[in-house]
Amino acid sequence: MARTNPLEKVRNIGIAAHIDAGKTTTTERILFYSGIIHKIGEVHEGTAVTDWMDQERERGITITAAAISTSWKDYQINIIDTPGHVDFTIEVERSMRVLDGVIAVFCSVGGVQPQSETVWRQADRYKVPRIAFINKMDRTGANFYRVHEQMRDRLRANAIAIQLPIGSENDFKGIVDLVRKRAYIYNNDQGTDIQETDIPADLQNQVEEYYTKLVEAVAETDDALMTKYFDGEALTEEEIRSALRQGTIAGTIVPVLCGSAFKNKGVQLMLDAVVDYLPAPTEVPPIQGTLANGDTVERRADDNEPLAALAFKIMADPYGRLTFVRVYSGVLKKGSYVLNATKNKKERISRLVLMKADDRQDVEELRAGDLGAALGLKDTLTGDTITDEGSPVILESLFIPEPVISVAVEPKTKNDMDKLSKALQSLSEEDPTFRVNVDPETNQTVIAGMGELHLEILVDRMLREFKVEANVGAPQVAYRETIRKSVTNVEGKFIRQSGGKGQYGHVVINLEPGEPGTGFEFVSKIVGGVVPKEYIGPAEQGMKESCESGILAGYPLIDVKATLVHGSYHDVDSSEMAFKIAGSMALKEAVLKASPVLLEPMMKVEVEVPEDYIGNVIGDLISRRGQIESQSTEQGLAKVASKVPLATMFGYATDIRSKTQGRGIFTMEFSHYEEVPRSVAETIIAKSKGNA
């Protein structure tokens, strides 16, 4: 089957921003103007196409990344609408991994918010080119120029305006296109009556100022243009457009546009910018992967290359299990057998579909550069690579943040136990930041996630989609343990003699603090066979298992490096089990000697309140063991940035509402792990041992 769109005419883009910047409304308008929907859906009415889960339509927020294919001026545009709430960071993370370009949406009133910075960092991590759309220009307090400056200051982006607004708030009536030096006046709110005119006289000076900045920025991308610019020659529209494209794809320029998606102003011009400035799959660097022998290879966006696709999302569906994939090279065909290279398992593709939110169109194949969904993949999870059997390669997986909050769950009736475990398995397959485990001591099922809202929505989905009513315990903090000093030559010796064959395992280890984020690291420096090779693995396993259950208070031990330096064995009595126990004993002993400490998740908390309430809010954050990092005031609103332990932040949404008469808002996201103060740690440890 021939390709319907040449690869140069494909754009894989995401729409990302902070909560309430208007992402979903922007997506709806794109779909409307590109002809995929015939009636505009509104978030506040609960009719948006990309918000298709019940919880999304009720809450007016986007939770999962909905993938949609549409077209604009002979270009195929695959769009992912991502959530702005920090509890759903994994959805943004996984979409950034498979995109070639991003539209970053900013609110012209709220400006650059904490979540904007998070999304920006994620786009930086995957080097995704982006354009910015300053939305809601019709709102009271709208200020394009302030947000443009915030992008330059707070995001350190080379944000270059390629449009300027004509008026703002109620007087917002059009847009100046700086590249073409033309004005577009919107004569109605449906975006159907647009008049192209000369630039209004009262804007001439401002337009010249920003046009000069634009020309300077594009001249820096190309030596020939720089020479022409210094020689005083004017750059042509085509030269500016071409250099802007080059700079955007290289990540050195972020073109800034403006409009009001809700009032249908600026959306068509934004679609033109997607086509003009964001890259085709052929214009981004080839994806890199690893062969079985450890060598690195590249896979180019080409139908004739071997198949390489990344599974970036799993979704339970009434018709079967949907695996969303980005095809980087080759062709994925319906009915074909493929290899899950990550797990080395053969799988069969039964169906392939292109998505229009919760609607779908069956297709025979997905080609290089396509985003779609496959049915029939039973063992494939988020981050797995799908390849031809003859050309296996493993693509770089996703960065998956660790959960920071957990709650115990149990079904309301014993009969629902099976349904609960099926629901939890299905939900954890969909969402890698959602973890499920059973506490070995209490036998309770514990679920962990990225925040209170995250877990609340998952419990809600258990009821709606799996018909499981669950009792949920109080939230628990995901504490961790680590060590502060190094210790050497710590012994673990397990000997058991009770007639007949005995047990003998003996190891000697050094233990030292590891680099942050390394978890548990093991190195063997055994020489001369004092510990036979077949017993080194079990000794490591014993240490690893001890790390999982912790030493101080039963929390996982992280960022430690154990080195096996010596030991001994018995020809008859030694066994894998004996060395596993010896490894566990050595690690526990070493940790107790290495100044063990408790770590807690610290959250980045930003609060925005009317000035009158700021004193109360700061006092409250300090009483929660918070560290105030910055404070600013703008237009009667005060903003406070702080780092606060998660343990003290449960129920904060209710507290801040009551402290500010409902006028305060806040965002909270995980920042890092930090040592718990001794007095607090003693209470936590005593509680874990049942002494409190």
Curated annotation (Swiss-Prot):
| InterPro entries attached to this UniProt entry | EFG_II (IPR041095), EFG_III (IPR009022), EFG_III/V (IPR035647), EFG_IV (IPR047872), EFG_V (IPR035649), EFG_V-like (IPR000640), EFTu-like_2 (IPR004161), G_TR_CS (IPR031157)
GO BP, sorted A to Z = ribosome disassembly
Where mainly found? cytoplasm
Annotated disulfide bonds: none
Q: Where is the tr-type G domain positioned along the sequence?
A: 8-282
Q: Does the keyword GTP-binding apply?
A: yes
Kindly list the GO molecular function terms attached to this UniProt entry: GTP binding; GTPase activity; translation elongation factor activity
- Identify the residues that bind GTP: 17-24, 81-85, 135-138
Q: Where does it live in the cell?
A: Cytoplasm
What keywords are annotated for this sequence in UniProt?
A: Cytoplasm, Elongation factor, GTP-binding, Nucleotide-binding, Protein biosynthesis
The record's listing under Pfam families reads: EFG_C, EFG_III, EFG_IV, GTP_EFTU, GTP_EFTU_D2
Q: Which PROSITE patterns match?
A: G_TR_1, G_TR_2
Cellular-component GO terms for this entry: cytoplasm
Q: Does the keyword Cell inner membrane apply?
A: no
- Which PANTHER family does the entry link to? RIBOSOME-RELEASING FACTOR 2, MITOCHONDRIAL, TRANSLATION ELONGATION FACTOR G-RELATED
Sequence similarity: Belongs to the TRAFAC class translation factor GTPase superfamily. Classic translation factor GTPase family. EF-G/EF-2 subfamily.
Q: What does this protein do?
A: Catalyzes the GTP-dependent ribosomal translocation step during translation elongation. During this step, the ribosome changes from the pre-translocational (PRE) to the post-translocational (POST) state as the newly formed A-site-bound peptidyl-tRNA and P-site-bound deacylated tRNA move to the P and E sites, respectively. Catalyzes the coordinated movement of the two tRNA molecules, the mRNA and conformational changes in the ribosome.
Q: What is this protein called?
A: Elongation factor G
Taxonomic source organism = Trichormus variabilis (strain ATCC 29413 / PCC 7937) (Anabaena variabilis)
| Name of the encoding gene | fusA
